[in-house]
Every structure is written in C-alpha cells, then in structure tokens.
C-alpha cells in the first residue's frame, strides 16, 4: 500500500500488530515517517532488542538487518541493537530471497527510536518511530499517538452508522 501511494510526505500511525521490519522498511524507503504502538513483553520488535529495564525510556537504534546466518553475523548479533537476523521464511522485501554461499552477506539498514512513556498512573505505552528526537520529544509523541484514537473512534462510529459491525482491518 505504501509503495503504490503518490503522497510525497506522510506520517503513518498504527497500532500493535502492524509492527514488522518489512512495514517499517517500506515506509523508510518512501521517506515517510512512522509511529507505531508496539507490544511490550517477549513478542514483537522490542523483544529482540536491548532496552533499558525502566518504566520510561527513549532509545535510538540503528539496525543492520540480514537474512543470512554466518559466523560473522553471529558475532554481530552478540552486540546489542546492532544487527537483526530475519529468517528467509519471514517476509522482508529488501533482501534477496535466495543466494549462494559464496555471495557476500547483504544488510538493510533501518533507524528508529523505541520510546516508552507513561499514559496514566499505572500504564505505559511503547512506540517505535523514525521521527527525530530533537524535533519530536516524548511530549510531542504522546500527542501524535493520542490523535490515533480520534481516527479509531471515528472509524468505529462510521462502522456502526453503516451497519458494518463485522468489518475488521487486516494486516
């Protein structure tokens, strides 16, 4: 969907379950911005990264993504937040699906921030974004993310008005 758009600049706001390295890479290739809510815990993009063990943080990450596992890649994987291996069975459109053993390892570079912030006394949200830290501090990110709720409730109201209660979004 991103690739087919003629829009020159956009900010893609999305909820959990839309997070994937492939989606983020497509948005980055288009020179768009993204702000996705991501899962906390042992699943999702944040699970494989070295993140602070604190309630709130803002961590810039520059990943080299590959779909080849070599001894050199294994060494890079030991360095926190440096390299990410994505198995070939997982979709990633910016690396070759097949290659010979003699071919050099290819990497795709992806830069983003993972930010965790408080939204109420006892709850937090974790987001992934490529918006610059200087231009978009945590307070701005909170406001941008809150705008997504307006879209969500408008979509729900439209579904009920049109009688489309069983219409669901798809990944």
Pin down the residues of each PLM region.
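Single, function-defining residue in the core of a domain
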Residues: 1-171
């Amino acid at each position: 969907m991103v690739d087919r758009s003629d829009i020159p600049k956009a900010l893609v706001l999305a909820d959990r379950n839309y997070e994937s390295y492939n989606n983020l890479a497509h948005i980055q290739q288009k020179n768009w911005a993204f702000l996705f809510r991501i899962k906390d815990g042992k699943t999702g993009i944040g699970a494989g990264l070295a993140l602070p063990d604190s309630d709130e943080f803002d961590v810039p990450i520059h990943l080299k993504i590959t779909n080849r596992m070599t001894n050199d890649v294994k060494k890079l994987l030991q360095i926190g937040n440096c390299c990410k291996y994505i198995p070939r069975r997982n979709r990633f459109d910016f690396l070759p699906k097949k290659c010979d053993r003699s071919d050099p390892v290819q990497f795709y570079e992806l830069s983003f921030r993972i930010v965790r912030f408080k939204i109420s006394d006892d709850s937090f949200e974790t987001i992934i974004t490529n918006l610059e830290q200087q231009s978009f501090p945590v307070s701005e990110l909170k406001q941008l993310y809150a705008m997504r709720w307006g879209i969500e409730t408008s979509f729900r109201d439209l579904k009920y008005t049109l009688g489309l209660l069983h219409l669901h979004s798809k990944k």
